[in-house]
Amino acid sequence: MSESVDSVELFTDGACKGNPGPGGWGALLVCKGVEKELWGGEANTTNNRMELLGAIRGLEALKRPCEVLLVTDSQYVMKGINEWMANWKKRGWKTAAKEPVKNADLWKALDEQVNRHKVTWKWVRGHIGHHGNERADQLANRGVDEVRGYKQS
């Protein structure tokens, strides 16, 4: 009997105070009604790097290949994965202007994770009350706060 593939919803977000500055990423995984919260941060980063890390860390947390609905409010992540990445790879991680792709280290890591799973991408507008997106935003801000030395109670 073949093992069934789990369906997972993954809500991701990034936050940065200063851009560049202290930043955080958040990921909320939902599988079979169970939620898992992930977050982290870096002292000197950008919002785009944190958006990417939210997606990467969420996908990395999955122990085996899954069907993933990845929900983000980041146009940067959506356009990168759906429009730009194929050409970046063809050009050896260069832009159309022959410049190195910004955040190529993270785009490569995301590409590796996406290839482990069957990912469907969904963009949602941020800060309009979407439960999963709001939780991911709170987690990303927790990551910022921890980097800045604030503790959550």
UniProtKB/Swiss-Prot annotation:
Function noted in UniProt: Endonuclease that specifically degrades the RNA of RNA-DNA hybrids.
Residues in RNase H type-1 domain copies: 4-145
InterPro entries hit by this protein: RNase_H (IPR050092), RNaseH-like_sf (IPR012337), RNaseH_domain (IPR002156), RNaseH_sf (IPR036397), RNaseHI (IPR022892)
Residues that bind Mg(2+) 2: 13, 137
Name this polypeptide is given: Ribonuclease H
Entries under PROSITE patterns matching the protein: RNASE_H_1 (PS50879)
Protein source organism: Pseudomonas fluorescens (strain Pf0-1)
UniProt family annotation: Belongs to the RNase H family.
Catalytic activity of the protein: Endonucleolytic cleavage to 5'-phosphomonoester
GO biological process terms on file: DNA replication, removal of RNA primer
Cofactor remark: Binds 1 Mg(2+) ion per subunit. May bind a second metal ion at a regulatory site, or after substrate binding.
PANTHER family (alphabetical): RIBONUCLEASE H1 (PTHR10642:SF26)
SUPFAM superfamilies found in the cross-reference section: Ribonuclease H-like
Keywords: Cytoplasm, Endonuclease, Hydrolase, Magnesium, Metal-binding, Nuclease
Residue sites binding Mg(2+) 1 per the record: 13, 51, 73
GO CC list: cytoplasm
Subcellular location per the Swiss-Prot or TrEMBL entry: Cytoplasm
